[in-house]
């Protein structure tokens, strides 16, 4: 596949995969505090793993983009779940399997706190992806 849309502020990339036969996942509704959820991903470069999560809160957070530039504000979920490298970019699902967010980070202070963009925050990128066809640059590589 190739990256056809990239948003460094939201830390989202859309990858076009020609001839992919899998159906798109359905979109769900906004989650509230204490709602159960599911994180799906490939933590630590391993096989697909699905882990339980619970919404701690839905917050408007200000932080850095992927290049370390400050001042990025995003609608996110704070989650009680173990998020590992390899979960980032994976879906946050409701208990019916519908996408309600996109996992993007874990806490540096608490092994059992992760973060996901809300569907509302990811929506502009997802909507623009429908018309995206040409490969785009993802910018310079970063370490860490």
Regions found by a protein language model. Name each.
Residues 13, 17-22, 50-139:
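Active-site region of chymotrypsin-like
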Residues 1-49, 133, 137:
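Conserved active-site neighborhood of the chymotrypsin/trypsin-like protease fold
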Residues 141-144:
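Short, solvent-exposed mixed-charge patches
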């Amino acid at each position: 596949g190739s990256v056809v849309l990239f948003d460094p502020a939201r830390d989202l990339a859309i990858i076009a995969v020609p001839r992919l036969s899998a159906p798109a996942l359905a979109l769900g509704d906004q989650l509230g505090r204490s709602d159960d959820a599911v994180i799906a991903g490939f933590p630590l470069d391993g096989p697909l793993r699905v882990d339980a999560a619970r919404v701690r809160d839905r917050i408007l957070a200000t932080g850095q983009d992927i290049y370390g530039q400050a001042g990025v504000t995003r609608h996110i979920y704070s989650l009680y779940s173990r998020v590992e490298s390899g979960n980032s970019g994976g879906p946050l699902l409701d208990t019916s399997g519908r996408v309600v967010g996109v996992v993007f980070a874990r806490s540096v202070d608490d092994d059992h706190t992760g973060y996901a963009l809300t569907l509302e925050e990811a929506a502009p990128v997802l909507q623009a992806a429908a018309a995206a066809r040409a490969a785009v640059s993802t910018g310079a590589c970063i370490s860490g």
